[in-house]
Amino acid sequence: MTRGALAAGPLLLAGVGTGHTAPGVLAAIAAMLAGINDRPGSRRASVRRLGVPALAGALGLLAGTYAGQGLAAVPLTLVLTLLGLLAGGISAVGPVASAAGTHLLVGAAIGAGMPAAASGWQRALAFLAGAGWLLLLRLALPTPGSLAGHSRFDFRFDGERAAVAEVYDAIAALLDAVGGERATARRAALTAALDHAQDALAGPRLRRRAGSAAERRLHAQYVAALPLAEAATALFWAGEPVSVRAAEGPRRLAAAVRGNTGTGPLPAPHRSAPALRALDDALLRAAETFDRAEDAHQRPPARRRDVRHAVRAALGTGGREYGLRVALCFGASAAIAQALHHTRWYGQHQHWYWLPATAVFLVKPDLGPLASRVLCRAAGTVLGALVFAGLAALLPRPAGLIALVAVCGALVPVATRHFAALTAVVTVLVLALVMTGGEPQASVSRIGETLLACALVLVVGHLPMPGERGGGVRARLATAGSAAHAYLVHVLGESGDRAERWALRREAYRTLAEARTAIALAAAELPALARHTAGTDTVAVVLERLVDTTTACAVHLDETGRLTPRHVRQLRAALDELMLHGVEVPLPAAA
């Protein structure tokens, strides 16, 4: 909340105070959009999470400004439609790319639909300055609670430290739940914690290796958690409850990471089964790593994603389907907005950005099911517009509006927990910004445009598209199947490269989690849309069982050098069930 309060409001104040109101408004909008992407995590990861969408937004603003200045309505609509196709395809690559696609289109809508005297490059620089200001605050300010304990004088890595500690806590929670009803949910929580820590540690860097002792220590502590997570997953697969004492070691390691202290005494080993022996061995190795981590040069396994993967995702079935839908929504909304502009729906001013910008956020499937997005957007906009209409009649100008922008900026991080609340806060903030920039009070027309955008996106969302519906979900399932097969081949090949095995296991579980998220969103759609992905949840469950069994095989092979009949039987059962669902994951000859 502190970063939000110090972002948009002060930028707008600086612009108004220096007589550069229009650049101040753009900078504040950029800071607001960056604030929506500001999530808990490491400072290093925030550089990519905030910086890449900011660059895309500046590029969209640049393109939209020059296109709006030089093109008539029809060619401008075609250009914006092509941008929608590009941004939609890019959004299929991943979360950061999805945010970049959103910012690209919002920037283009503002550039074309909010004409200004400044040139395109001047507006783009103002946008970058606003997003850069929030990024600077993100890098410079400590997060709440980071100034306590032994790490209070070095809060640079508080996000990484919290993420790694959560991994050890998740391992302990899984061990507590083994053999119980909550075990599956705890295993999924462990995957999420490992994913979050991997992202926190793998942000952009100038040097190949960690430069400080504190960062090297965190890298080593994360790597030490991987065999612990592997052993805990093997125990989960076995399904037999373990003693309460088994979870004490990971909990003490979590406390040591969080407080940046030593591990202290660990519980005595309990070596009655191969998976328990693996857990005890991993715990002892982790304790040794904690003692000498500053001198270690271990790198966490990184995701093997390159430009070719991004291109395949953007041009694949999911990228094509999403790109066409975004292009149709964005192009149609821009055409309707320009038609309304020429009929003086907006009055005497030249701003028609609201309708296409609203359509961009509504067409994003990663913000929830379509019907839910539409209802939340409509309710949030109505509430926000009505609140702003009341406040605008009471607050002095421009001081009151600037204060309102600062308050809304502080509320954005809290409001991100619910799309309707976020919509209401952003509506008040944007209306205050553009009124400060000279646009008249337009709450009623904004409500009308939002409802029109909701209807448009609902219609387009149910239109048939070329190719198979649900392509994005099936593409993620196919990726998860390929990752599971690569992991299975490595384990049954009995390679001694554990780092490679851990990297493959991480990729298998991570792609499965991504597929699960996409399946859950698709299942929550209205029946007309949800039916296109029916049965995919069953495939994901079987793939998870296959990866869990592969992990149990890896641990058992390490301890005994051979598989039990139960391991082989479970592998064959999972592979046969996948075959029935049309997913082919061949069993290696080694089995």
Role assignments for model-derived ranges:
Residues M1-G9, L13, A124, L134-H349, ...:
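Cytosolic regulatory and coupling regions of membrane transport/channel systems
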Residues A453-A455:
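A short glycine-rich beta-alpha junction/loop motif
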Residues L458-V459:
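Cytochrome P450 heme-binding "Cys pocket" and the immediately downstream C-terminal segment
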